[in-house]
Amino acid sequence: AGFYMDLYARSGKRGGAWMNDQISRREVNGKIQKPIAYLVCNFAAPVGDNPSLLTLRDVETIFHEFGHGLHHMLTRQTELAVSGISGVEWDAVEMPSQFMENFVLNWDVMQTITHHVKTGKTMPRELFDKLVAAKNYGAGMANVRQIECALFDMLLHMDTHPEKDTVNKILNCLLYTSPSPR
């Protein structure tokens, strides 16, 4: 498998960060074509002798997009329509990428990837703990949002004979009440 990165912003480049597949794993004339993925970001480029410095969010972005890349590159499926990230439902396609984000808040991992730009020293444990605490602040509300999305999905797909306004009924129920709309 192959993996390429284009990390820095430049004129004419669209914003955001993403992983894209250049080549998917498939069988061609009896031989396996190995997958190739590329990761594109828009981080601040190095200036002169000063390196590009990444925020915690930037590092999470790299790990997240690399999770998509791993999903694509490690596939064993040779049927093009379902190889790598192709044909994977949107909620499932995020699993490997969100899993990879967890490594950013792992002390052992952070010790290997963080170094002070001038001294070369690794991040102090106290600073790491503060970053984790800040990251986790309000995490309960993010979980509530995910539960709301899951509940919406369940309620929508449980209805075998939906009415014209089923979506609106479910949304109104989730937004303004707590009991099930059924």
Q: In which residue ranges do the predicted regions lie?
A:
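A glycine-rich beta-turn/hairpin centered on an aromatic-Pro dipeptide
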Residues: A142, Q146-L171
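Active-site recognition of the HExxH zinc-binding catalytic motif
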Residues: R57-H72
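Acidic/histidine-rich catalytic neighborhood
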Residues: H72-A150
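Alpha-helix N-cap/helix-initiation motif
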Residues: G48-V59, V82-E89
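Conserved small/polar residues in nucleotide/adenosyl-binding loops
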Residues: Y176-P181
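Short loop/turn segments at secondary-structure transitions that flank enzyme active sites
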Residues: A9-S11, A45-V47, R76, F103-N106, ...
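Active-site-adjacent "gating/activation" loops or surface patches in catalytic cores
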Residues: A1-L54
